A protein has these predicted regions:
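Short, hydrophobic/aromatic-rich segments at coil-to-beta transitions
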Residues: 1-4, 99-105
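Short, compositionally biased "basic patch" segments
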Residues: 1-19
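Metallo-beta-lactamase
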Residues: 10, 24-32, 103-106, 111-199
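Short, glycine/acidic-enriched capping/hinge loops at junctions between secondary-structure elements
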Residues: 13-16, 28-29, 37-40, 186
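Residue-level detector of beta-strand structural context in well-folded domains
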Residues: 14-16, 93-96, 115
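Flexible, charged surface loops at secondary-structure boundaries
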Residues: 18-21, 41-47, 67, 120-121, ...
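Active-site HxH/HxHxD metal-binding segment of metal-dependent hydrolases
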Residues: 30-100, 192-197
Length: 200
């Protein structure tokens, strides 16, 4: 698991690398720098990775990154139109499972095509994009702001997500938003998922 520096092209958002076989994944777009591109090539090695986008908020300068790497991109179908020159580009509607067993779920609210990515045990990780945002050390919660697409849908998506996660799984949470509020932490325990942020 690898966390890239905050991406100023996506409001300081976070991009994660998960080294799986046979298909490692890059979740959301890191900063377009030579350091990022070099790290990605080294992490990939001889494998053929895929880029997973959790929402339009995580696109950053994806087209330029994808041009340099040539990796296929997977995005929820509602936001494919935002990436007209990205090839190869694949879409999904409600659910998707990758070659390495990652499970994607459409969770609209923050944006029309928001989704989450669940890595089952033994990884046991939930990449929640902007659906859950850091608001304090060890705490993630939904945040309503000017860019929120549809707040009631976001709350419905959170309820759907709780039911979708296997009952015997309590995955660690990874946000695609800026992580400053976590005060140096990266991963948040499942118990840190709050349905309402106290400062909202």
């Amino acid at each position: 698991l690898w966390l890239f520096p905050p991406n100023r092209d996506s409001q300081g958002g976070s991009s994660w690398w998960l080294g799986l076989d046979p298909e490692p994944v890059l979740v959301d777009c890191p900063p377009l720098t030579e350091a990022s591109l070099t790290a990605l090539r080294q992490l990939a090695g001889t494998r053929s990775p895929r880029i997973l986008l959790t929402s339009r908020e995580g696109h950053g300068r994806l087209r330029r990154v994808q041009e340099r790497l040539g990796w296929p991109v997977l995005v929820q179908e509602q936001e494919a139109y935002l990436l007209p020159n990205v090839e190869p580009l694949e879409t999904f509607s409600e659910h998707h499972t990758t070659a390495s067993g990652l499970r994607l779920l459409w969770t609209p609210g923050p944006t029309p095509g928001s989704c989450v990515v669940f890595a089952p045990p033994p990884k046991n990780l939930l990449f929640c994009g902007r659906l859950l945002t850091p608001w304090g050390p060890g705490q993630l919660a939904p945040m309503r702001h000017a860019r929120t697409f549809h707040w009631p849908r976001q709350l419905n998506s959170l309820a759907k997500l709780r039911d979708w996660i296997p009952s015997d799984a309590s995955p660690q949470l990874l946000s695609g938003a800026a992580l400053g509020a976590l005060r140096g932490e990266r991963l948040v325990p499942f118990s840190g998922w709050s349905d309402v942020a106290e400062n909202c």
